[in-house]
Amino acid sequence: MLRNIILILAILFLLESISFSLSANLTLGLALLWLITVSLFIGVVFYQPIAAFLSSGIGIWIKRIGILGIVLYVGMMAFLGLAASFTQATGNEQAIVVLGAGLNGNEVSGTLRRRLDAALAFAEQNTDLPIVVTGGQGQGELRTESSAMKEYLIKKGVPADRILLEDKSTSTRENFLFAQRVLAENGYENIREVAFVKNRFNCYRASLIARRTGLQPAAVPATISITAALPCYLRELPAVLYYWFIRRS
């Protein structure tokens, strides 16, 4: 029975791994997804010896530690998914900051499009707030992310003079720091309360980073596609742990 469950999980993870591999570059999330897939198939092929090892001696402790690790990982992923709701934007903020993501050629990617659509919906309800699109030119990209973002919003009907462009940043921290600079250069000085737009899975870490740049952030969480959700959450947890215990800035 358990072996059949593992086999079903292995097949599902394989389909997810292949699907995401066809639409994304190699990332930590994708690598972890393939690692889990391979591990599940190994578990199916060598089920009997593995089960025997885990049923006695040190194997019992390895099994307990493994189960605990899985529970903690799943719990943390659930926390990351819910965290954006704790500090959700209300419309009382002073500006909207849309953080960049990868491009597909000259066009915004699916992930970035979802952020821009979330920003657009929020901006339509709060027409007095300036919009900062922030993102430089990543490796292998044909243009800056912010230029593609601005173009997308203009096509959706946002006035060009409402959109401020920040095209030098290469990290989340720089997104927030340079966005503040662009706001100040355009007459929006001493902006501290911002509504930032990110996909739900990384709103928590982005909020921590924003606070350390002197901002009072509130999240406008964007959705994410079903195929991208699992690898993105798998990648985000190590990033959060790295930020908690190593970088802290």
Tell where the protein language model's regions lie, with residue ranges.
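A transmembrane-helix-recognition feature enriched in membrane-embedded lipid enzymes
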Residues: 229-249
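Transmembrane helix-loop junctions and nearby membrane-interface residues
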Residues: 17-25, 78-85, 247
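Single-pass alpha-helical transmembrane signal-anchor segments
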Residues: 65-79
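Membrane-embedded alpha-helical segments of integral membrane proteins
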Residues: 1-49
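Hydrophobic alpha-helical transmembrane segments
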Residues: 6, 62-66, 233
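Cytosolic-side transmembrane helix boundary signature
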Residues: 36-68
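A structural signal for short, hydrophobic/glycine-enriched beta-strand patches
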Residues: 75-235
